[in-house]
């Protein structure tokens, strides 16, 4: 690293006093010296009389520039380094004023619509359908693959990424912001990396790894929901097709094969190297980003747009761990959906009877926590056995998109069944980044976890076409049902016998000589007729 001049150091010091530790990904208009100095990211929408004349579309009533509201409630004890990470209080360590959009308007400059709305005035309801990839027509499958490849090669039209930490963000001369362009798909990868990266504590110190703003906590589902929604919106704009939707991969097959790993879809296994994708697939040409973990952790650098090696994938190939050689079963999903509490203390990867922890895959599908278990989402990732099984790299494998759309479908079904019951989503004391009102890192404009805790068809503009498996009974439940049935049968027989005994007793009383002898003969004849029926019963 080059040493800046004394003047540059002074300049940087003044800026850092204001911003503390910051920098991630922001709108291109905000990656400027002026915006960084002022701490204001409120781009113009349609400036008619010079820069700053239409911040956030103010002239047309679309939005206004306001102070950022960041969650300040306490987080859990898992993160002991308060003040050392630029993601704390997101995004206030970078900008303290952003666009607040009115009504159904949205976007970094209020120039787009909220999810679920469209039209020039954002007053038209929009609903797209996410379907099973295997149910698409041949043309639809081809179009999806082509769209992914296009996103990999198309520069993101709005966002740039930081390539240096706050101390170096202005460059060696103190006057050159260190941001880079990045493709739409690699931006999708980068945001995931940034949410899971370790906290850099300084040169010569080991980076802190027990921090994750998008996994192992209540925000797992809400964070990944917005992550997918952002990619879907970016691809819709890229294709100029608001009806485009991300399909899903129903990984709950219980099989030891990957049914979407074919060359016409996500790529089959290479015949030349079992850890690579077949050269007949377009995805064999993809190169990964954010793989230089050692540099990030020891030098404090950030992932940049440089691409490295190929995607690695070997489904069911981890012979050292038989548990991850087979995908989850359909009944695992059915059982998971019966876990009624969204989350439970300590709101972490060891929570039990937590729907979130169950679908994330740290608990048994019934909700029971077991440190040896990897199920559902986690198991599907580990089954891929390669790039897709490494948290910081996993989105580089495009199967990530399909795996998480299905996980989101399970989440949305749970929200529907339980009326989006947020009572067990903690307001505070969740792992850092996971409180209900926390702005999810590093999305822009700021969006809270609670904003994604809603049913998608009614609030986010998409729905799923999916058939959910019915739950089968476990062996213990079958035994219980059999015992109850047997006891019920005994009870019925006993009740029937009691009734017959009482009936016979009543008949005997009726035979007593309450009348004259001539009527007794009638009774005897009556007995001869009806006694045979009693033996049948």
UniProtKB/Swiss-Prot annotation:
Broad enzyme group: oxidoreductase
Pfam families tied to this protein: Tyrosinase
Cofactor dependency: Cu(2+); Zn(2+)
Domain of life: Eukaryota
Positions in the Cytoplasmic compartment: 502-537
Post-translational note: Glycosylated.
Membrane topology recorded in Swiss-Prot or TrEMBL: Single-pass type I membrane protein
An example Gene Ontology molecular-function term: metal ion binding
InterPro entries: Di-copper_centre_dom_sf (IPR008922), Tyrosinase/Hemocyanin (IPR050316), Tyrosinase_Cu-bd (IPR002227)
Keywords: Albinism, Copper, Disulfide bond, Glycoprotein, Melanin biosynthesis, Membrane, Metal-binding, Monooxygenase, Oxidoreductase, Signal, Transmembrane, Transmembrane helix, Zinc
GO CC entries: cytoplasm; intracellular vesicle; melanosome; melanosome membrane
Residues involved in Zn(2+) A binding: 192, 215, 224
Subunit structure: Monomer. Interacts with ATP7A. Interacts with SLC45A2.
Protein family membership: Belongs to the tyrosinase family.
UniProt name for this protein: 5,6-dihydroxyindole-2-carboxylic acid oxidase
Origin species: Bos taurus
Lineage, highest ranks first: Eukaryota, Metazoa, Chordata, Craniata, Vertebrata
């Amino acid at each position: 690293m080059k040493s800046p001049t004394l003047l540059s150091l002074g300049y940087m010091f003044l800026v850092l006093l204001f911003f503390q530790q910051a920098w991630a990904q922001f709108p291109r208009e905000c990656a400027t010296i002026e915006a960084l100095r002022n701490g204001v990211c409120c781009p113009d929408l349609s400036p008619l009389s010079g820069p700053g004349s239409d911040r956030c579309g103010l002239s047309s009533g679309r939005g206004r520039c306001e102070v950022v509201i960041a969650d300040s409630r306490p987080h859990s004890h898992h993160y002991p380094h308060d003040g050392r990470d630029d993601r704390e209080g997101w995004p206030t360590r970078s900008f303290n004023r952003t666009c607040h959009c009115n009504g159904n308007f949205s976007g970094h400059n209020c120039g787009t619509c909220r999810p679920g709305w469209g039209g020039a005035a954002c007053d038209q309801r929009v609903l797209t359908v996410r379907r099973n990839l295997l149910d698409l027509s041949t043309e639809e499958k081809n179009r999806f693959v082509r769209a992914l490849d296009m996103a990999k090669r198309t520069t993101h039209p709005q966002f740039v990424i930081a390539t240096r930490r706050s101390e170096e963000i202005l460059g060696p001369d103190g006057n050159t912001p260190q941001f880079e362009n990045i493709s739409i798909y690699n931006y999708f990868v980068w945001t995931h990396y940034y949410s899971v990266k370790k906290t850099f504590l300084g040169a010569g110190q080991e980076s802190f790894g027990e921090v994750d703003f998008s996994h192992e906590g209540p925000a797992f589902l809400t964070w990944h929901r917005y992550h997918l929604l952002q990619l879907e919106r970016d691809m819709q704009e890229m294709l100029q097709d608001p009806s485009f939707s991300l399909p899903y991969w129903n990984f709950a097959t219980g099989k030891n094969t990957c049914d979407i790993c074919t060359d016409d879809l996500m790529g089959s296994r290479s015949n030349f190297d079992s850890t690579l994708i077949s050269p007949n697939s377009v995805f064999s040409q993809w190169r990964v980003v954010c793989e230089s973990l050692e540099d990030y952790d020891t030098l404090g650098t950030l992932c940049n747009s440089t691409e490295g090696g190929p995607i690695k994938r070997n489904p069911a190939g981890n012979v050292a761990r038989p548990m991850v050689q087979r995908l989850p079963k359909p009944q695992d999903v059915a059982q998971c959906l019966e876990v009624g509490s969204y989350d439970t203390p300590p709101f972490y990867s060891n929570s039990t009877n937590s729907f979130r922890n169950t679908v994330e895959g740290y608990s048994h599908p019934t909700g029971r926590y077991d440190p040896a278990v990897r199920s559902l989402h986690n198991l599907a990732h580990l089954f891929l056995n390669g790039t897709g099984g490494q948290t910081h790299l996993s989105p580089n494998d495009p199967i990530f998109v399909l795996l998480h759309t299905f996980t989101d479908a399970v989440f949305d079904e749970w929200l529907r069944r339980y009326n989006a019951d947020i009572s067990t989503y903690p307001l505070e004391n969740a792992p850092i980044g996971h409180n209900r009102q926390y702005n999810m890192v590093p999305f822009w404009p700021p969006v809270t976890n609670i904003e994604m805790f809603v049913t998608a068809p009614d609030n986010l503009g998409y729905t799923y076409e999916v058939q959910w498996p019915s739950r089968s009974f476990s062996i213990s439940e079958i035994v219980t049902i059999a015992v109850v049935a047997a006891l019920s049968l005994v009870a019925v027989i006993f009740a029937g016998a009691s009734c017959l005994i009482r009936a016979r007793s009543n008949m005997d009383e009726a035979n007593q000589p309450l009348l004259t002898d001539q009527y007794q003969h009638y009774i005897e004849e009556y007995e001869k007729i009806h006694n045979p029926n009693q033996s049948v019963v």
